Amino acid sequence: VIVLDCSPARDSNSANVGEGQLGRGLLLRYHDRSMLSFPELIAYQEEMAKKAKVKTQYFSSPGGTDAGAFHKSGEGVLTLTHCICARNLHTCSTILDVEDYLAAKKTLITLLNDFDQTRLNKLKGVRR
C-alpha cells in the first residue's frame, strides 16, 4: 500500500533547521506514532527518487497517517507513506512548495513504473 499524505513543515522558526522543510523535496517518512516504516521499502523509495533526480529529506513525526491502519491490518501489510510537507495543515490556508509536490509526483510515477511482482517478492522475502 502506498499512502499519499502531507506532513507538518518544521521550518517556520528563524533557525530553519530540522526535518520537514519546504523546498527540500519528498519526505522519506521513516517513523511516526502509528507505524515503523519497512527499511527496505524506504530504501527503495529513496532509490526511485534518485532515479527521478529529485530531492529527498528524512522525516519522523509525533503524529500519524492513515498508513498506520494499513500497516497493522491482518498479518501486516507492506506500507509506504509518500509525503511532502506543508505549513498550516488542516486549515483553509495550507502552504506547500510546488516543487516538492512535483518531486513527489515524479518519484511516485517512477516507482510505479519500476514496481513489479519480482520487486514485491524480494521485499516480502527480506523479513522471513
Label the predicted regions:
Residues V1-L27, R119-L123:
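Acidic/histidine-rich catalytic neighborhood of metal-dependent amide-processing enzymes
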Residues R24-K105, L111-R128:
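Active-site-adjacent substrate-binding region
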